[in-house]
């Protein structure tokens, strides 16, 4: 078991993810009610960028942070972040679903975030997004053997098992490592790939910018996160669900929608 206190002696294993659970599932374990929300889709897209299945072209120098409300400046920044779908080789069903969702939203393999954001104000696009999002979540659950209440030997009837509590503690220690300057300097990532992987896991806990601040910005993924790309994806996808014209009732679906942000302009 990994503890995290001043008396504990650490070795380089502290920098390794404690299990092979996927990023969306790790995020779900730390979320309220263990839900898979829109951030699961955003995390899947980050992973596809990291795997070079989605190319990322950013025409912007320096770091960028989105404020509490989207401004015209934010929209212009989004215009300078272009994604291009370049999927090659075998993909998981959920990865294919995520890519198809992006294609359907944008009617193209290449698009910038501003254009995608404005599309989500169109109710027909939003309705299609909801269906595609449901397909993505369904595929993700199937791949991970998760039915919303039970997951491996970690969750039973929506409650952490003894093993689950142990795993969660280990992930908490890894989370603490990701944002610890002292531990990161002592046990730094040894490659570009490991550096990106650690920052990707940081996104699972919403500390991706903290993790990046003490690591290198040396890949397409880290540059995307440096421009607040993860947060922007969540805002865009939340906006799509807010603009669904026919709200369903009684199906128990929870999206984790945050309505603080609105996308200016029509579809």
Predicted regions and their residues:
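Acidic, Ser/Thr/Pro-rich intrinsically disordered cytosolic tails and loops
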Residues: 1-267
